[in-house]
From Swiss-Prot:
It comes from Vibrio campbellii (strain ATCC BAA-1116). FAD binds at residues 6-35. Belongs to the GMC oxidoreductase family. Keywords: FAD, Flavoprotein, NAD, Oxidoreductase. This is Oxygen-dependent choline dehydrogenase. It catalyses: choline + A = betaine aldehyde + AH2; betaine aldehyde + NAD(+) + H2O = glycine betaine + NADH + 2 H(+).
Length: 569
């Protein structure tokens, strides 16, 4: 076995596959990619509609759980992370949301110098081929294919949801990944010609054709090998055998917001109290490793549908078989979409410059495991506040790499987070009770019309909220005078030579949207940094900000306000 490489990357996920491709592209560098999981060649991964299967299986995902979360009355939430080629991009819901421009300007304000929106935009474009074609926001020749599924053509509910948002006084946006995030419009997904556009399909497939690239699967990384304050390699286990490999240039951890923390701490890099408690020798004290953990939560707002047009009629075995057969033969139809084809981003209150609430609309009422929520037809909106104040932590509990770490998100632990949820429930109910939904909207199944007071909303949210599976920010970038910053603006671990982290853990703050798109962007930009390339930069590309955002929460008053809604339902 070859033991020496130029670059060693741990984790073939959303970021690791990008790095593997870009670092091996010139043919000048020997690149090794280590992955704990195995092949992604399964219809349950490749067919978009099957998205609920891989994230719930041991084969394709680390089945982590949180501790009993105090803010959720002691509930433990599921926290699956990809353990397969493509990582979480092979098990996620394929929703393509870059985030708001203000999110990246916020990163820079938090100390991640140079990570403002104008610096990030070229790398979003570089990664993408958008079916609508290239413009100053969207990419036209990148590895990741993005689209709007079936362009909302297969169900009238998608457009009805957008019209309801307009009825409620919110703007319409044609492209939330472009000039204007705020508003109601079509939703985009990482689906390329009907197939999941994971980073394995988009990037790793290219790297695997190169003689200077090596992929090793079924590998458990034990620790980063250090010589003093320099990273020189990785110790790992494969088929029960402990092995070592060495990096001439750099080691890069792309193991994700749980895995990268675990690897650093197992290597003796992290908070002294955590390492001492776990019985790990402290090699380098960095208090921020595993801190600042953030996530998105969501609830499902569900209604009966008065017309028999929803996907609830497609959940039987015969229907699934027909959908699967059409997809196998044509890569088209209901198999070629994640079914989230319309969406919205709104501000919950005046004084916010950019949105903090996200909606995914689904023309079905089901649970995340893919089973029906009730008999008959229904629809639902996945909704939650996307800019939480709550911060959590990841901590290893022992020196054994096979022991699951302690994950505590500290969900809904601030007064503002609680208020955001109250606003979220009330605003969502108001939107879904606008005239545009009258022809379709039946009884409100959940939360239920009795959930109206602050106390009732708070209790219902605690019992019904689920993770949107967006753990992030646990190895944040920051300035040298920030004692909790794990990385500098070049993704380098502070105080350790030859070691970087490149994945969603490096975000200083969680963006307003799903995490796959910004994670790919981060990896594209980090690849240029690692290779010493000149960083690309946009030139003041304009971004829509709501006029009078300081004084108004939305553009116009709703056609129906909340006080009149109880009489409609």
């Amino acid at each position: 076995m070859q033991q020496h490489y130029d670059y060693i990357i741990v984790g073939a996920g959303s970021a690791g596959c990008v790095l593997a491709d870009r670092l091996s592209e010139s043919g000048q560098h020997q690149v090794l990619l280590l992955e704990a999981g195995g092949s992604d060649k399964s219809i349950f991964i490749q067919m978009p509609t099957a998205l609920s299967y891989p994230m719930n299986t041991e084969k394709y995902a680390w089945q982590f759980e949180t501790v009993a979360e105090e803010g959720l009355d002691g509930r433990q939430l599921h926290c699956p992370r990809g353990k397969v080629l493509g990582g979480s991009s092979s098990i996620n819901g394929m929703v393509y949301v870059r985030g708001h421009a203000c999110d990246f300007d916020e990163w820079e304000a938090e100390g991640a110098k140079g990570w403002n929106y104008q610096a990030c935009l070229p790398y979003f474009r570089k990664a993408e081929t958008w079916t609508g074609g290239a413009d100053e926001y969207r990419g036209g020749s990148g590895p990741v294919g993005t689209c709007n599924g079936n362009d909302m053509k297969l169900n009238p509910l998608y457009q009805a949801f957008i019209e309801a948002g307009k009825d409620a006084g919110y703007p319409e946006t044609q492209d939330y990944n472009g000039y204007q995030q705020e508003g109601f419009g079509p939703m985009h997904m990482t689906v390329d010609k009907g197939v999941r556009a994971s980073t394995s399909n988009a990037y790793l497939s290219r790297a695997k054709k190169r003689s200077n690239f090596t992929l090793m699967k079924g590998v458990t990384a034990h620790r980063i090998l250090l010589e003093g304050k320099k990273a020189v390699g990785i110790e790992f286990e494969q088929s029960g055998e402990i092995k070592q490999c060495f990096a001439n240039k750099e080691v890069v951890s792309s193991a994700g917001s749980i895995g990268s923390v675990q690897l650093l701490q197992l290597s003796g890099i992290g908070p002294k109290t955590v390492l001492d408690k776990a019985g790990i020798e402290v090699k380098h004290t960095l208090e921020g490793v595993g801190k600042n953990l953030q996530d998105h939560l969501e609830v499902y707002f569900q209604y009966h549908c008065k017309q028999p047009i929803t996907l609830n009629s497609k959940l039987g075995l015969i229907s699934k078989g027909l959908i699967g057969t059409e997809w196998i033969l044509t890569r088209k139809g209901l198999g070629a979409t994640n079914h989230f084809e319309s969406c919205a981003f709104i501000r919950s209150r005046e004084g916010l410059k950019s949105p903090n609430i996200q909606f995914h609309f689904l023309p079905a009422a089901m649970r995340y495991d893919g089973r029906a929520a009730f008999d008959g037809h229904g629809f639902q909106v996945h909704v939650g506040p996307n800019k939480p104040e709550s911060r959590g932590s990841v901590e290893v509990v022992s020196a054994n790499p096979n022991d699951k770490p302690k994950i505590e998100f500290n969900y809904i632990s601030t007064e503002q987070d609680k208020q955001d949820w109250r606003d979220c429930i009330r605003l969502t109910r108001e939107i879904l009770n606008q005239p545009a939904m009258d022809a379709f909207r039946g009884e409100e199944i959940q939360p239920g019309l009795n959930i109206t007071s602050d106390e009732a909303i708070g209790e219902w949210v605690k019992q019904n909220v689920e993770s949107a599976y967006h753990p992030s920010c646990s190895c944040k970038m920051g300035s040298n005078d920030d004692p909790m910053a794990v990385l500098n603006e070049a993704c380098q671990v502070r105080g350790i030579e030859g070691l970087r982290v490149v994945d969603s853990s490096i975000f200083p703050t969680i963006p307003n949207g799903n995490l796959n798109a910004p994670t790919i962007m981060v990896a594209e930009r980090a690849a240029d940094m690692i290779l010493g390339n000149t960083l690309e930069q946009s030139n003041n590309t304009p971004v829509w900000i709501a006029p009078n955002w300081q004084e108004t929460q939305r553009m116009r008053p709703p056609k129906r306000d909340l006080s009149s809604i109880s009489s409609i339902a």
